[in-house]
Swiss-Prot record:
Name this polypeptide is given: S-adenosylmethionine synthase
Residue ranges of coiled coil: none
Subcellular location: Cytoplasm
GO cellular component entries: cytoplasm
Signal sequence, start to end: none
PROSITE patterns: ADOMET_SYNTHASE_1, ADOMET_SYNTHASE_2
Naturally occurring in which organism (per UniProt): Marinobacter nauticus (strain ATCC 700491 / DSM 11845 / VT8)
Database matches in NCBIfam families: metK
Positions contributing to K(+) binding: 44
CDD domains reported in the protein's UniProt record: S-AdoMet_synt (cd18079)
């Protein structure tokens, strides 16, 4: 993690078909959690020309107008006409949702809530680095910001000829573990057919790329590739089939940290694929914020139906102020990583998840949300509220 001289990460916009699918799945989850916080949800979505298929396993007392919900998400992203390539008003919505298996439920549900078992076996990772202000790797942070700016320029009318689908990629150069330059930038954006490539490239360079990336990291040899294949009129679900869970590296650390393989979107907090990955980020970020290390990666693993993690391991890549073994002892003392405890620690039983489904689950600022008369914190795993206690306990 600390040995690369050059590292590249990518991101995609909210209009990318895989991200559209993620947002639909998480919108379904949010709608259910609003009325039934203890629902079991595993919602998968596929989007393709003229159709959205929603499936999975859901056990809940809540009722959701699925068709209206799906159409609303599609239209919010501005897929509103066949000219753009996808129309939330006219596309077909197919519902193939079933209930959670009783075999899985018996492994999760317990008489004592704190004994709640993990919803599946698996391994999850959390990571943090002090190379950016949000304690995230720079390449993925810059990549997210580019496509966020693309959406902002499109929605505000600054660049009205932009369309929803876009991808970004940023290559950073490192010296002694610190970012010293950006060597390459790729930004491909869907657009209306009547804009010229010359106008598009000039506007995107000035109003998106230069507006977003730190000027001090751009240099005379930085490569810029804006719509390198030429026109990009056909996009979204017409150009590519979109599926929930296909952008797990975009969702996390851009490849800078390991990934256990489990996707996030459409899953309620009883699924440790999601909740334990969030807890891992929370732990790693507080360790770095406390100054215990410059970089930290934590792995946690579970067995289905078992509350206690089967393992907790940690690596600070030689940047720790104390030994990794001592940091693990602090983690065990300050963080309860049983599934039910994670849900309580991070207050996860709220409809906050659609907001996570584009532009990364990590490196986002926590903020207050109010839904259904209840106020809660979105992105609570980004808080650094345990850093002071960790620092005191470490004696540094």
């Amino acid at each position: 993690m600390s040995d690369y001289n050059i590292f590249t990460s990518e991101s995609v916009s909210e209009g990318h078909p895989d991200k559209l699918a993620d947002q639909i799945s998480d919108a379904v989850l949010d709608a259910i959690l609003t009325d039934d916080p203890h629902a079991r949800v595993a919602c998968e979505t596929m989007v393709k020309t003229g159709v959205a298929i929603v499936g999975g396993e859901i056990t809940t007392s809540a009722w959701v107008d699925l068709e209206d919900l799906v159409r609303g998400v599609i239209k919010d992203i501005d897929y509103t006409s066949s000219e753009v390539g996808y129309d939330g008003d006219t596309c077909g919505v197919i519902n193939i949702i079933g209930k959670q298996s009783v075999d899985i439920a018996q492994g999760v549900d317990r008489q004592k809530p704190e004994d709640q078992g993990a919803g599946d076996q698996g391994l999850m990772f959390g990571y943090a680095s002090n190379e950016t202000d949000v304690l995230m790797p720079a390449p993925i942070t810059f990549s997210h910001r580019l496509v966020q700016r693309q959406a902002e320029a499109r929605k505000s009318g600054l660049l009205p000829w932009l369309r929803p689908d876009a991808k970004s990629q940023v290559t950073c150069r490192y010296e002694n573990g610190k970012v010293v330059g950006i060597d390459a930038v790729v930004l491909s954006t869907q657009h209306d057919p009547d804009v010229t490539q010359a106008d598009l490239k000039e506007a995107v360079m000035e109003l998106i790329v230069k507006h977003t990336l730190p000027a001090e990291l751009l240099h005379k040899d930085t490569q810029f590739h804006i719509n390198p294949t030429g026109k990009f009129v056909i996009g979204g679900p017409v150009g590519d089939c979109g599926l929930t869970g296909r952008k797990i590296i975009v969702d996390t650390y851009g490849g800078m940290a390991r990934h256990g393989g489990g996707a996030f979107s459409g899953k309620d907090p009883s699924k440790v694929d999601r909740s334990a990955a969030y807890a891992g980020r929370y732990v790693a970020k507080n360790i770095v914020a406390a100054g215990l290390a410059e970089k930290c990666e934590i792995q946690v693993s579970y067995a289905i139906g078992v509350a206690q993690p089967t393992s907790i391991s940690l690596n600070t890549f030689g940047t720790g102020k104390i030994s990794d073994d001592k940091i693990i002892d602090l983690v065990r003392a300050h963080f309860d990583l049983r599934p039910y405890a994670i849900t309580n620690m991070l207050d996860l039983l709220h409809p906050m998840y659609r907001a996570t489904a584009a532009y990364g689950h990590f490196g986002r600022d926590p903020y207050e949300m109010t839904v259904g008369g209840k106020t809660f914190t979105a992105f609570p795993w980004e808080k650094t509220d345990r850093a002071a206690a960790l620092k005191d306990a470490a004696g540094i």
